[in-house]
Amino acid sequence: MSISNHLPKFHQHFILNFTIALVLVFLGSTAHPYYVGVTEVSIETAKKDIRVSCKLNMNDVQLNLSQTAGKAIDLSTITPANQLSLSALIQSGLTVQVGSKRINLAFLGYSVEDDAIWCFLEAKNIKYYPRISVCNNLLYNQFESQTHFIHCIVNSFIWLTNKIYKITI
């Protein structure tokens, strides 16, 4: 015999509604409140190459790719199909310009780190100009509050928020 048979209807509805509310609160708490990515652009003028690494929340990227593909995407397993999908996303949302020339970045791959993914790109034989422009609008269409921190390193000097720091290794 069930305990619900002994409770008044009001209590049964209260318990049901309370349980539903708890489930909704729990499900809502799994979403994270901040949508932040980190992009690092490293330029070695002597080598004439540009290396880019981009860190994004894996669940956010999977959601974006899944909606685009119309099917579930799981980036925790590195496959050629995942590499291709991720490359297309990164190439469409991340641009690096040196001087007045947009640089074609080759997607090298990605790695998984806890709940994040690191994407790696590079360009070789790039003539360096003093002006570098980096535009990262990855996931802005997906999340209104998405933001990105961009670090630009040129010959061991890093530019962060209009200040120049010397990196010592």
Listing of model-derived features with the role each one plays in the protein:
Residues 31-169:
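N-terminal soluble domains immediately following signal/targeting peptides that reside
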Residues 13-27:
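Bacterial N-terminal signal peptides
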Residues 2, 29-30:
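Polybasic/polar functional segments that serve as interface/processing modules
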Residues 1-12:
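N-terminal secretory signal peptides that target proteins for export/translocation
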